[in-house]
């Protein structure tokens, strides 16, 4: 299959090839807690989002700053709201970075996102 270069699914190809075979080896490990066999995998998207604000001294010029971290907090809440357990779609912000010092309104922030989908349309929705 062309899984590594971006196929939407290789299930049809696997089923077609399986009809010609007596034995099939699947090198995918079983579920860790139950030992259940894998019959499908979620699609994966990994994203890095950069946010730019405006630095300012937190004590003297706070009002002149635009906090990239504050904006990042809003974005994280929004991104997590896209999770839909009924559609088996999960979105996780797993890594965040930002700021340059305790007394500086953060000029930059970055977050890393992991998206998992089971249905093709979910990629478009998210």
Kindly give the residue locations of the regions a language model identified.
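Acidic/histidine-rich catalytic neighborhood of metal-dependent amide-processing enzymes
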Residues: 1-40
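Metal-dependent amide/peptide-bond hydrolase catalytic core
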Residues: 29-34, 39, 45-126
